[in-house]
């Protein structure tokens, strides 16, 4: 059962078709690591995260940001089954990476900020509401396999 209306789905997919995954992914993960510095502990293997400029210029941050948004693209194709889409990622983050599920909401909120910056007037309050619903659904799906 989906909580997404036809209008939500249209708003999400329409904007997603205009998103440059490379630009938005790097910006989103970079901002996450700057704004919420405690999240850096999950990315020890990324090299220097010593300053905002080091983080924003770090190629591993950009590459992982692309990976995250590519996964999000899969979610957008499967809005009616977010838990199924993210089942294996939920298990990975729980069992192997030991990420506190409270952290799952942070990247989505940062992404919404990045989309607002990159898409300006096109990112209307209605579009934002649909995206907030979607990133909340993704965070919930990522936390679904925790025990």
UniProtKB/Swiss-Prot annotation:
SUPFAM superfamilies reported in the protein's UniProt record: Globin-like
Q: In which tissues is it expressed?
A: Red blood cells.
Q: Which residues are listed for heme b binding in this entry?
A: 64, 93
Q: Which UniProt keywords apply?
A: Heme, Iron, Metal-binding, Oxygen transport, Transport
Superkingdom as given in the UniProt entry: Eukaryota
What are the recorded GO MF terms, alphabetically? haptoglobin binding; heme binding; hemoglobin alpha binding; metal ion binding; organic acid binding; oxygen binding; oxygen carrier activity; peroxidase activity
**UniProt KW Transport keyword:** yes
**Domain Globin intervals:** 3-147
Pfam families per the UniProt record, alphabetical: Globin (PF00042)
- A single GO BP: hydrogen peroxide catabolic process
A GO cellular component annotation here is: blood microparticle
What this chain does, per the entry, is described as:
Gamma chains make up the fetal hemoglobin F, in combination with alpha chains.
Q: Which family does the record assign? A: Belongs to the globin family.
For this protein, the record's PANTHER family field holds:
HEMOGLOBIN FAMILY MEMBER, HEMOGLOBIN SUBUNIT GAMMA-1
Question: Assembly state and interactors?
Answer: Heterotetramer of two alpha chains and two gamma chains in fetal hemoglobin (Hb F).
Q: Report what the protein is called.
A: Hemoglobin subunit gamma
Which organism does this record belong to? Answer: Alouatta seniculus
